[in-house]
Each structure stands twice: as structure tokens, then as C-alpha cells.
């Protein structure tokens, strides 16, 4: 916008606000308002015709191109992967030669169909799209003329308001008289300009309306029959699709189910698919389970102590423990059994109190019914259900349980879903782990 246009816009701004809020005197022409309404309808119809014809032209071309690309993708899926493209025997179909042949035949049919529809699509572009674009250019020029007419109306109302302000004064000075005469001259000029553009549009718009009835309506009719011809061609060519691989006589869902077979069961039997399903659970649910496992007390309560005492792995408590020397400790290290210890160590750390010598203890031996030393207790002896790890698992987040393949894990809490997150204990550590990594 030039500086002159910006200046005019500032001068017209107050009158524009008054016109929007219907304040003061506003110049109106009922004949022009009706013509303006019809002109807007023509403008909208022409834009719609241009946009819809473009969309249809691009949609048909895009649909055919996508069908060709789809057939190419299916053929690539059926073809085996080969690292030597120069070897002719490397590209021999090994999996589904019928599927490759069907995809190539379908690709050829679609290419032929695209060549058949090419003249019809070009006819749409020449007979519909291009004429609609030319009509839009004419409408845009008329719209500029209508905007100029609206600006002249604002100027006329603005000058009339200025003139009425001086005329309403009861006592006018000489300076007011000069301004009033100047305002009268401006009103006359603005009235002439407004009448020129207003009469021009009122005389020319009916001609456009007559041309519209002779131009736009036939375009819609032509567009309809062109679409009908394209749909008929698509229907007839697809109905004549003679590819033995496709059974077009049966229901499409039944044919798909028959060709699919038991592929879902075979896929579920692969271990890697269960791995993906297990880790595809909601992160929020996994986080809740980790926090629940971290906040729950460890399973080393009275039940585990009782089971340890009854199992016989550790010696019983001796009443004279405070007076016994260091060598009389009843603790058995789980790393090595008593049968492989030296005589000195066996006499001091592993042997019962009955066999302690007076020299070593400094007091008479006490008879305590203790079980002889045995092998170290197994990792799992708390009475909880256990499971065996099928794979190695490394903790992915805080609260996870790490274990190697073959490890025996105590199950503290489990879900009904084998792919869920279970809570267990291994090697003194408590945490959560995926249930599909273990076997009961």
C-alpha cells in the first residue's frame, strides 16, 4: 500500500466504524445491494467449481499412481533378498511366484487404465479448470471495482457529515462560511464519483449474470458427464480384471481369511513377537508396578526366619554365647561346605560344641543338640512359588530385577497375563521383571 492509500485509509477509518455500527446517515442503493448479493453467489460458485475440478483431477491421477506403487511394493515383498544383483539365479522367486505374477499383472492393468483415462482427465483440465480460472480473473477485476465504489461511498458520507456539521451551526463566522463552501464542493465531487462507479456496476453486473447462466451452468453439466465417463471406465476395466490369483466370485472377507490361514498362530509362536508385546505395555502401568514393588516390605519376615530355623541349614542358638570365645561361633559360611574345610577350621568354626576341646574354649564343653554341617542352603527356600528364567534380563529402569538365563526366581506377585510385569526376588534383590522372560 502506498502512502497516499494509507492516508486515505486513516481518513476513512472513523466513517468505516460508524457504518459498521449503523451510526449516522449512510448512503444506500437497494438495486446495487441486490446485484452485490448475486455477484457474491457467482463468485462462490466459480471458486467452488475451480477447486473441486482441481481436486478431482489430482485425486484420480493420485489414486492410479498409488495403485501402481502399491503393486510394486507387493512385488518387492514377495521377491527374495539377494546381495548379488549380477547373478541371475539370485533373483529366482522362492516364496510366492503366483503373488509376484499377480502384482505385476495388476500393475500392468492400472498403467493401461491410466493411459485410457488420460484424455478424459486432460479434457477436464481444458474444459473445466482453465475456463473457471479465466472467469475468476474477471470476477477479481469486478471485485476491485466494487471495493472502489465502497470507498467512494465512505468519502461521500464523510463529506456529508462534515457539511452538516457546519450547516447545523446557528451563528457561523466568516471562517465557518469558507469551510462550509469548501465542504459543499467536496460533497459535489464525492457525489459525482460515487454515482459514476455505482451506475457502472448496476449496468454491467446484469450482463455478467446473463453470461453466468450461459457459462457456469454448462460447466457443471460437462463436469458431471466427464466424471460419469471416468467412473464407467474404471468400473468396466476393473470388472474385466482377469487375474487367476484373485477370486472375485467369493466374498472379499472370506477370501482374505482363507488366504491368511493360520499366520497369526505361527506369528504368536515366535518368541520375539512376545518380547515386543511385553514391552509394548503402557509405561504408566509399568511405573506403577515398579513403585509398588519398591514401597512394599521385603519378604524376609517371620515366615522366612521360621523356615530357615526348621530347615536345619544354620545351627541353633547357644545360651552361653556371651562367654564363648571367637572360635566357638556357630555361623556357617555358605561358600564352602564343612567336608572340604581343614581340621583347624573345622574345629573352630564348623564343629558342634560337643567336639570342642577345653584348651580351645577355656570351659567344659556344652552338649547342644546341633545338626552336623551340611551344604549351603539354596537361594530359594522361603516357600514362595518360583520360576526359571528363559533369557537374560538387564534392568532397564530403577526397580527392575536383573537375572541371567536359568536363574531360579522367587515370585512375590504375578499377574494373570503372562506378558505383564511380575514382582520377584533373586540373589537378595527384589524388583519387577517381564513375565514372558520366565517359565513356571
Curated annotation (Swiss-Prot):
Spans annotated as Disordered: 286-380
Keywords, in A-Z order: Cytoplasm, Cytoskeleton, Endocytosis, SH3 domain, Virulence
Domain SH3: 382-440
Keyword match Cytoplasm: yes
Primary localization: cytoplasm
Gene3D superfamilies for this protein: Arfaptin homology (AH) domain/BAR domain, SH3 Domains
PANTHER family: BRIDGING INTEGRATOR 3, REDUCED VIABILITY UPON STARVATION PROTEIN 167
Function, as annotated: Component of a cytoskeletal structure that is required for the formation of endocytic vesicles at the plasma membrane level. Plays an important role in virulence.
Stated name of the protein: Regulator of cytoskeleton and endocytosis RVS167
Organism: Candida albicans (strain SC5314 / ATCC MYA-2876) (Yeast)
Lineage, uppermost ranks: Eukaryota, Fungi, Dikarya, Ascomycota, Saccharomycotina
Amino acid at each position: 500500500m502506498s502512502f497516499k492509500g494509507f492516508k486515505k485509509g486513516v481518513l476513512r477509518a472513523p466513517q468505516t466504524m460508524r457504518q459498521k455500527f449503523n451510526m449516522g446517515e449512510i448512503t444506500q442503493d437497494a438495486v446495487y445491494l441486490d446485484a452485490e448479493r448475486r455477484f457474491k453467489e457467482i463468485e462462490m460458485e466459480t471458486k467452488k467449481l475451480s477447486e473441486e475440478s482441481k481436486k478431482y483431477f489430482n485425486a484420480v491421477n493420485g489414486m492410479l499412481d498409488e495403485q501402481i506403487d502399491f503393486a510394486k511394493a507387493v512385488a518387492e515383498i514377495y521377491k527374495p533378498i539377494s546381495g548379488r544383483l549380477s547373478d541371475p539365479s539370485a533373483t529366482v522367486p522362492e516364496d510366492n511366484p503366483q503373488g509376484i505374477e499377480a502384482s505385476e499383472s495388476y500393475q500392468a492393468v492400472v498403467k493401461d487404465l491410466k493411459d485410457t483415462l488420460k484424455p478424459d482427465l486432460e479434457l477436464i483440465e481444458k474444459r473445466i479448470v482453465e475456463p473457471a480460472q479465466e472467469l475468476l480473473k474477471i470476477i477479481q477485476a469486478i471485485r476491485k471495482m466494487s471495493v472502489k465504489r465502497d470507498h467512494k461511498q465512505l468519502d461521500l458520507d464523510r463529506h456529508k457529515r462534515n457539511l452538516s456539521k457546519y450547516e447545523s451551526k446557528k451563528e457561523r463566522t466568516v471562517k465557518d462560511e469558507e469551510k462550509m463552501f469548501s465542504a459543499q464542493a467536496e460533497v459535489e465531487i464525492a457525489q459525482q464519483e460515487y454515482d459514476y462507479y455505482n451506475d457502472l456496476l448496476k449496468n454491467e453486473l446484469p450482463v455478467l449474470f446473463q453470461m453466468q447462466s450461459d457459462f457456469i451452468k454448462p460447466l457443471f453439466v460437462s463436469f458431471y458427464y466427464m466424471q460419469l465417463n471416468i467412473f464407467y471406465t474404471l468400473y468396466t476395466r476393473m470388472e474385466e480384471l482377469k487375474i487367476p490369483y484373485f477370486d472375485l466370485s467369493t466374498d472379499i472377507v472370506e477370501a482374505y481369511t482363507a488366504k491368511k490361514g493360520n499366520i497369526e498362530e505361527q506369528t504368536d509362536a515366535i518368541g520375539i513377537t512376545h518380547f515386543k508385546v511385553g514391552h509394548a505395555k503402557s509405561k504408566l502401568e509399568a511405573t506403577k508396578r515398579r513403585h509398588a514393588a519398591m514401597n512394599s516390605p521385603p519378604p524376609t519376615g517371620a515366615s522366612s526366619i521360621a523356615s530357615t530355623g526348621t530347615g536345619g541349614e544354620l545351627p541353633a542358638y547357644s545360651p552361653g554365647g556371651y562367654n564363648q570365645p571367637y572360635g566357638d561361633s556357630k555361623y556357617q559360611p555358605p561358600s564352602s561346605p564343612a567336608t572340604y574345610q581343614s581340621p583347624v577350621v573345622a574345629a573352630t568354626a564348623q564343629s558342634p560344641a560337643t567336639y570342642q576341646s577345653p584348651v580351645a574354649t577355656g570351659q567344659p564343653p556344652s552338649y547342644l543338640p546341633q545338626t552336623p554341617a551340611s551344604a549351603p542352603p539354596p537361594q530359594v527356600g522361603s516357600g514362595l512359588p518360583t520360576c526359571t528364567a528363559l533369557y537374560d534380563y538387564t534392568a532397564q529402569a530403577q526397580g527392575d530385577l536383573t537375572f541371567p538365563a536359568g536363574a531360579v526366581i522367587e515370585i512375590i506377585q504375578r499377574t494373570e497375563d503372562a506378558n505383564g510385569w511380575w514382582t520377584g526376588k533373586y540373589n537378595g534383590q527384589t524388583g519387577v521383571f517381564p513375565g514372558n522372560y520366565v517359565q513356571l
